[in-house]
From Swiss-Prot:
It comes from Streptococcus pyogenes serotype M1. It is found in: Cytoplasm. This is Guanylate kinase. Belongs to the guanylate kinase family. Essential for recycling GMP and indirectly, cGMP. Its EC number is 2.7.4.8. Keywords: ATP-binding, Cytoplasm, Kinase, Nucleotide-binding, Transferase. Residues 5-184 form the Guanylate kinase-like domain.
């Protein structure tokens, strides 16, 4: 049986560039990840594909999934639900494949309470002025919504201490490389590999006894 995969939880304030950095991480074949597509009730943006960028669902559909316990985590953010389907994540980890979750901060904290051995990475902007410039440059939100997102970002940055790692997104390629190094290092943590060697030692002892 293969070792259980790593659950990588990647989050940060709205507009920090999570999606762009995640795409950069996945653009090179040096590590195999399975990207867990999040579910949301927010409107689909131009160029987004259902089942690729997000699973887009109505509020009623989402609330039914919550009621039946089919979400690993969920959060309501600026009037919309975001969450992670549970079954897909567990099935993939059990196959020994790493699962990469790009989710909101509220959701990440829920996951940490359920899966404490996950790898929690917080993506930060260089500063709040840069974050506001990025939100304005997206051209998808009103000034009122942008102001709400900045206030929410301050609250989320204060929760950074709940994460294992913080990565500054000052340049996309560099930020992606930092995240990949973190994941590579996590695979070598003693508590993640000791089980394999415990089994090896047990098998060796049993073989000597048999002789």
């Amino acid at each position: 049986m293969s070792e259980r995969g790593l659950l990588i939880v990647f989050s940060g304030p709205s507009g920090v560039g999570k999606g762009t950095v995640r795409q950069e991480i996945f653009s090179t074949p040096d590590h195999k990840f399975e990207y867990s597509v999040s579910m949301t009730t927010r409107p689909q943006r131009p160029g987004e594909v259902d089942g690729v960028d997000y699973f887009f669902r109505t509020r009623e559909e989402f609330e039914e999934l919550i009621k039946t316990g089919q979400m690993l985590e969920y959060a309501e953010y600026v009037g919309n639900y975001y969450g992670t389907p549970l079954t897909y994540v567990n099935e993939t980890l059990d196959k020994g494949i790493d699962v990469f979750l790009e989710i909101e901060v509220q959701g990440a904290l829920q996951v940490k309470s359920k899966v404490p051995d996950g790898v929690f990475v917080f993506l930060t902007p260089p500063d709040l002025d840069e974050l506001e410039d990025r939100l304005v440059g997206r051209g998808t939100d009103s000034q009122e919504v942008i102001a709400q997102r900045i206030e929410r970002a301050k609250e989320e940055i204060a929760l950074m201490r709940e994460y294992d790692y913080a990565v500054v997104n000052d340049e996309v390629a560099l930020a992606a490389e930092r995240v990949k190094r973190i994941i590579e290092t996590e695979h070598f943590r003693v508590e993640r590999v000791i089980g394999r060697y415990d089994k090896m030692i047990k098998i060796t002892k049993n073989s000597f006894k048999a002789k």
